[in-house]
Amino acid sequence: LSTIGIFSKFEMCGGSEIRCLELANAIDRYTDHTPLLLCEKGMPDKLLSYKNDEVKVVENIFLPEPINLKQLYGVDSLIIINTDCKDFSTLDYWEGRSARHTVNIDISKISQMVFLYNFIVSPSRHLHTISKKGIDVRILTTNTRFFEEIGKQDRYEMVRHLPRMILNSPINTKEVCLIKNASNKIRIGRHSIGSESKFDVENLNLIKEINKRYENDIEWDFMGVPRRDKKELKKIKNVTIRDTFSIPVPKYLQDIDIFLFFVSLKREEPWSRSVAEAMASGCPILATDKGGNKDQVINGNNGFLCKNKKSFYEAIVSLMEHKERIKEMGENSILYSKFFTSEYIVNKLVTFIDLKS
């Protein structure tokens, strides 16, 4: 059996960190390999609740002291989840010359390093410095945009020869219910963290404009909204506001018919876990026409890609006037969600890293 290490900084409890946990869970559940979660420093208690009991966590690889450094040398493949850290992709990081730590490892003892770019891809241009050490270096990108950027821009010329593949986030769909709770109204909403970048300021005006036409036919339900908008949203009688993750996501999605992913128009969403979960539950997706949303939404098929408030308005009107399309698009979402289930993703990963059982 081979051991697959998953290394990251695990400082937060966001989508990137949850991705690490679900990937480890999937390796444990669906393959003959052994996953090992390797933390630069430590792992927040909140993250541990996402972990299978059988998955082992090793803290303090580098910080505050390299107590468990040797665990790096015991893996057959090391997957580095590069969230927003620009240092992991440099040889300086692994040889203790970055601002993050001063620990110099013998990188030659790591036979394979697979770098997964989940939030930014530009640091991958430095991977040739690691590859020159005789390491088998491979690249995973979370979306098509990142993948194509490496192939097109001159700054990636030194790493373009390295094996690379698109790998979406693994989504555990086992608890997702495909049957919506009955309602005589169309329920529109979304769940996410309450960050302003995840909820465009124009959402409020969109709701008001749609309500002028369909107030008696729609219920809005948002789990996780910015403080900036809460006061005004609470004034609208057909809007429900919930705290972030106040109820389990699968349960929440049973009461959502259309998933509204109107994040800030300035935001390039890499690949949305909340959109993926909504797809698995059978929701049409209305999302901004940017970033990884283009990988998840086929315009006019399982939802709509929208460039501004006007196109979000038009998409909602289209579905309200042709309600049969909500079911049709929702069924397409379920079909496409099969390509990012945890089992599908982990088998794709294992094939790419090419380890022997």
Stretch-by-stretch model annotation:
Residues N172-T173, N181-K235, T244:
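Conserved catalytic-core segment of nucleotide-activated headgroup transferases in glycan assembly
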Residues P284-A287:
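Short hydrophobic beta-strand element within catalytic cores of glycosyltransferases
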Residues K307-K310, E324-D354:
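A charged, aromatic-enriched C-terminal amphipathic alpha-helix characteristic of glycosyltransferases
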Residues K198, F261-A276, K294-D295:
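Nucleotide-sugar-dependent
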Residues N299-K310, S318-K323:
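Conserved acidic donor-binding segment of nucleotide-sugar-dependent glycosyltransferases
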Residues D257, G282:
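A short alpha->beta transition loop at the rim of the catalytic pocket in nucleotide-sugar-dependent
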Residues S8-L21, E196-F199:
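A short, glycine/small-residue-rich beta-strand->loop->alpha-helix junction that serves as a flexible
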Residues I120-H161:
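A short, active-site helix/loop in glycosyltransferases that binds the activated sugar's phosphate group
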